Amino acid sequence: MRGVTSAPAAARVVEIDTPQGPARAHLHLPAGTDPGGRVTVPGALVLGHGAGGGIGAPDLVAVTTAATGLGYAVVLAEQPYRVAGKKVGPRGPALDVAWTAVVEQLRAHVLVGPLVTGGRSAGARTACRTAVATGAAAVLCLAFPTQPPGRPDRPSRLPELDAVPVPVLVVQGATDPYGTPPGSPTRRVVVVPGDHALKKDVAAVAAAVTTWLPTVLPTPDAP
């Protein structure tokens, strides 16, 4: 799984209207799953991209491949600014509004079953801030940007993590300049080789996620 740099082909791509403009949801399904209509699965992940990157980030690709291999669905969601071709997104509140709208529409028209929300970096922050609004069963944070590097004057983002009332998995690079948040009774933190990009050992990223997912979602072989 090393060196993965592009997202696998989606079984279905859905454009979703949000108050911030159209977003795009790329639906990835376990083998043999009919992509038409509403998809019933034991559980699904809805993951967002980082501030300056897209859904082809190596960690997102690795998690998508691993989770669908377990029997879960994965949606890689593009924020409206990315769909519009912009490289820089709006501030957090606008991201949160769009993200919440995406998850609501996925629940209403695409996916049946419990959802884990999450993403990498800025996408992880968005998922944390909206965990209650989206009804997430759990939150997956890849490379959570705890403290801006070299900016001790800037407030820590740790309160966003602490406010999440459901189980959280944080997968963090050992040399991430944004630091590593502490664990807690409801927050598991797994440190893997690499920096903020989490591309040095994507197999370790995938392994951390596949170990955790069955603890927060029904197993695919459950009756």
Report the location of each language-model feature:
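Catalytic histidine-centered segment of alpha/beta-hydrolase-like enzymes
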Residues: 194-208
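Serine-hydrolase catalytic machinery in alpha/beta-hydrolase-like enzymes
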Residues: 13-114, 126, 157, 191
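Conserved alpha/beta-hydrolase "acid-adjacent" motif
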Residues: 173, 177-183
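Active-site nucleophile loop of the alpha/beta-hydrolase fold
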Residues: 79-80, 141-149, 194
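Gly/Ala-rich beta-loop-alpha elbow adjacent to hydrolase catalytic centers
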Residues: 119-127
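Hydrolases whose catalytic domains are alpha/beta-hydrolase-1, hotdog thioesterase
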Residues: 126-130, 150
